[in-house]
Amino acid sequence: MSSTTFTHLALATLLFSACAEEPEGPVTARAGSLLADPTLDFPETIEELGLFPAVPTLETTPVEAKRYTPVWPLWSNGLEKLRHVRLPEGTVVDTSASDSWEFPTDTLFFKTFTTADPSHPDGQRPVETRVVRILADDVEYASYIWDADGLDGQRSDLKLPVEIEVTEGGETFLHAVPNKLQCRKCHESHPTEVLGFAASQLSGETVATLTDEAVFGSPPSVHAVEHDDPEVREILGYFQGNCVHCHNGSDGPSSSYDLGSEVA
């Protein structure tokens, strides 16, 4: 190989490597996406949400989306979930009312269901992404069903429930995408209509991180589920994550009785 040919190959390799590198520094929401402007109408595709700009990986998200994980997550047939909150610029969550936090108008909550898939870059393939938007006097819901390749997906019309066949842990089952009435039935049974994001659901570490990320004006107190018996604590925690959002003693459509840890 001549020195000229070697030089050309080296330059080509260098250029290819430079193009393949991920951009350095924080990623910001793409202009025109819902994440960039939470007041926009819900888009028709997942790409237009702007939440996952580097698919097929789901780990890269814009700085506007703050990730969080509840201490007691809702059980969904073993599916994992990615949760993000996006506040309008210059706003914070009002946590002065203990476990009935107030969220700024146009706050967005995203929840993405994933199933284990070793062929996917993150080891998890997305199945569905749900979006909740807080309005001044209402709440809006949207759901998006991912394509099989995990690169994009389409918005569901929420008129009828949709079932998606999913294999998780060696078992195949039908994952249910709810209709709008089902969304409302669960969410409207909770005083804030936001599930999994409250003083009883976030750890002190998560609250500290979200405070650093300017989600809270000051770190709120957390209300951990406590009991001397670890097994009882796990049971009460399961109630907290899976039952109390409906069964909390309020006047919501599914609140016929109270399973809060103070009562149960």
Question: Model-found features: residue ranges?
Answer:
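Generic detector of short alpha-helix boundary/capping microenvironments
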Residues: 6-7, 73, 94, 171-174
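Conserved small-residue
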Residues: 27-97, 103-105, 110-117, 125-166
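C-terminal motif of bacterial Sec signal peptides marking the signal peptidase cleavage site
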Residues: 16-18
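Bacterial N-terminal signal peptides that target proteins for export
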Residues: 1-9
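Sequence context surrounding c-type heme c attachment/ligation sites in exported
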Residues: 20-29, 100, 118-264
